[in-house]
């Protein structure tokens, strides 16, 4: 019984772009994969990290990982958009075999419980 392959795309954004713009890029690439007929399995912000060597005079970068499955056509669309973007300094897509990755909960991405939201509204 063979499992359907999936793809993992890791890309590095320039470290000097604002947080709002980082979110815009993440959303744009997720939507691009979905529009190409693939399913987004997982999307992780790995944060700002030091690079092993300077890339385009940058010593740090904002790492983002995007896991998706589909027929492979979405990879060309995604990589072309990343190649043309000035904010993406490096990207790599790897075809994975085996079980699909389980969705991970990234700290800070969990919604607040309703009781905490109501308490914050009362205090304000």
Swiss-Prot record:
PANTHER family: MITOCHONDRIAL 28S RIBOSOMAL PROTEIN S6, SMALL RIBOSOMAL SUBUNIT PROTEIN BS6M. HAMAP family: Ribosomal_bS6. Residues 114-124 have a biased composition (Low complexity). GO terms for biological process: translation. The gene is rpsF. It comes from Prochlorococcus marinus (strain MIT 9303). One of its GO terms (cellular component) is cytoplasm. InterPro entries: Ribosomal_bS6, Ribosomal_bS6_CS, Ribosomal_bS6_sf, Ribosomal_S6_plastid/chlpt, Transl_elong_EF1B/ribsomal_bS6. Keywords: Ribonucleoprotein, Ribosomal protein, RNA-binding, rRNA-binding. Belongs to the bacterial ribosomal protein bS6 family. It comes from the Bacteria. Pfam families: Ribosomal_S6. This is Small ribosomal subunit protein bS6. SUPFAM superfamilies: Ribosomal protein S6. The keyword GTP-binding does not apply. GO terms for molecular function: small ribosomal subunit rRNA binding; structural constituent of ribosome. Binds together with bS18 to 16S ribosomal RNA. Residues 99-124 are annotated as: Disordered.
